[in-house]
Amino acid sequence: MNLFLNQWKENVKKYGSRPAIVDRDGTRETTYSELDALSGRICTALKKKGVGKGDIIPVCMERRMEFLAAELGILKSGAAFAALSPEYPKERVAYILKDCGAPFLLDDDFLEEASGEPLAEAEEVSGEDGAFAVYTSGSTGNPKGILHSHASLAAAVARHRAFFLPKESDVQLSCASFSFVAMMIHIYTPLSPG
């Protein structure tokens, strides 16, 4: 199975100067190479903090390109991410941090730290390794975390790509919250074909 990080690496080589993401008002465009460089710096900063396989790092910031770069940086470090909304109550964020054993929350302050780091290569991951954790709403008590593997992400992206984005030139609008599970498909499917 061609895991997402392998597809990403190929696409950065093939389509480095192409736009990977455009903000909602069309004023900010980020290429595959730019997104890859920022995520590589984030990966370096994470590795310096001892982050790697088996870790889950929650990301909490406004919906923008840097959120995606943070997720990619976490994946490159070998860890899994949990996307959190900045609108979550502090108690919910604290519970999720404790539940997933996260050493810290990746936020805007962390991005500032990572901005001067050198680029790091992605760690090798297997299909069984964790890629991202999604937390339930917690409507019946505390939120419950569900860890999804790299194989699960790759299979979902492949299915959605074949159906919704069969051509490289296709684009996709993404408007759901980054903390919503369907968002993983909305983000990673368009990035996989280039």
Q: Model features per residue range: what roles?
A:
Residues 1-151, 165:
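Carrier-protein-dependent adenylate-forming modules in NRPS/ANL systems
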Residues 144-173, 177-194:
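Conserved AMP-binding/adenylation subdomain of ANL enzymes
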